[in-house]
Amino acid sequence: MSTQICRRFVIDGIRDTMDHYRAGALPLHRLSWELHSRIDTLVPHAPAVWIDQLRDLHRRIAEVHERGERTPFGELDRRELDDSLRLLRVALEHNRG
């Protein structure tokens, strides 16, 4: 499979994963795991700077999940999660290739 085809396939998978989360069909811990796995899959197919950006956004999502495991999920957490998902979608669109 070519790098460009693989990259598009993985990006579509990330987008689908976010859509499933937003629709309530995927819990936050699974969203975090899926994002981590799919971003790792992109490593040989994408520039390191972009991978670092995606990983940073994933870390923000994972941190919200970890805080939610310890304390009730608050409005600030929800806003941070929404912002991270929005930025992740923008990053995917700009680097679709």
PLM segments and residue spans:
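Acidic, Ser/Pro/Thr-rich low-complexity regulatory regions
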Residues: M1-G97
